[in-house]
Amino acid sequence: MRRRLLAVLAALIATSAALVATLVVTPGPAAASPAGQFTNPLVNQRADSQIVKHTDGYYYFTATVPEYDRIVLRRATTLQGLSTAAETVIWRKHSSGVMGAHIWAPEIHFIDGKWYVYFAAGATDNVWAIRMYVLEGTGANPLTATWTEKGRITTAWDTFALDASTFVAGGVRYLIWAQSEPGIATNSNVYIARMSNPWTITGTPVRIATPTLDWEKRGYAVNEGPTVIQRNGRIFLTYSASATDANYCLGLLTASASANLLSASSWVKSPQPVFTSNASTGQYGPGHNSFTTSEDGQSDILVYHDRSYRDISGDPLNDPNRRTRVQKLYWNADGTPNFGIPVPDGVTPVRLQSYNSAGSFVRHYNFRARIEANVTPLADAQFRIVTGLNGGGTVSLESTNFPGYFLRHRNFEVWVERNDGSATFKADASFFRRAGLSTGTGSDAAVSFESQNFPGRYVRHSGADLFVQTATDATSRADATFTLD
């Protein structure tokens, strides 16, 4: 196969009926769900990342390592804990022959009481003879399980194939993967087939995605790394497109959960990518994703890799600095996923939902702060709660899509403006985080923000616009209370 920059896999989903909640994310969170904050990057120099939440209370993590020579696992009871969790090598490449080079995109699943790892590998005498393979693990903890090689997944053609993932829908287990098909002038397409067991497909594979759009063919004509999240009666299949540099991005296929998934016409491709590089936030080439859920099970979490710089010296395949990142996945009112933008490094952002105007969120519009429902783009309503610019135990709220811009009051109106470094700005943009005035619970789910330099005045909405005003009655206290989402 041509030297298409690093082949990648996406991850997750797929599980036995006993573990549907583990690997297939099903309906659960409402339009707003409790915020969970993480610090990115989660794991440096780990690409094609997959995180699985298992029923034993642990998150399991696997990814491609820069040396392309082994399969590793980590586990922790929290997502953030994976950052520092010990890493265990469960398998190493062969010293000769097949499975001897380019060990890429491992993905772990628990099926019918056993662990399975899907991965791609080349051969020592032909590193580009990439094919899909399966390991089977016996034991409660996959880091200490006994692993055996189940061999290669045989498909319709003996061609470049990678990024195997599996999921269950309607009681049927499917395999999805990327492959180069003879007679089609693309680097890889996405396919689906039924499975007769965790390492064997049955029937005729069906091609469901081909790189035909401009954004899918930048550098290379690639559709790869498929993975699934099931929600709201639909199956959403994300895939990665183009070369694995700053052009790399996520596309989306959608099918009804009741449709014939082995019919290509059941899958509808979104005309635009759903997740792309963002120069403002300093994130490039986001892709090869998976999905997991928050510790409380109420929020869906997007897992992916990217780089912190656009320009790469030489072949991106030789650049080791793709890193694992996580951020909350949101859902639109129509039941479709909203990926937003790859958020800046550091603490992840939240949305501030009005306590007394459900479904309305703080956003900036022409840099004026206000509350509004169905905010587009999503990032206009996302803010990072960071250490207060003026110190003293305060916090500041930084715009996600305009890093360096903060909520601040000016003439008691709340605006989103660039930090000019002045003492006045720092004071105007610093707030004490209080328990929600309307609830008094002190929980993270209900908060109010009191001005540091005008004690007794709180961020509140009056109508749609935000002001810094006193909150002396029930209405104003409710106006000054927000839930974190």
Please give the residue ranges for each predicted region:
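Extracellular glycan-recognition/adhesion modules and their associated mucin-like linkers
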Residues: P344-R368, R384-E413, F432-A464, T481-D485
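Short polar catalytic/cofactor-binding loops
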Residues: A47-D48, D56-G57, V65-E67, N356-S360, ...
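Carbohydrate-active catalytic/glycan-binding domains of CAZyme proteins
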Residues: S33-V350, D380-T387, D428-L437, D444-A446, ...
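N-terminal export and membrane-targeting signals
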Residues: M1-I13
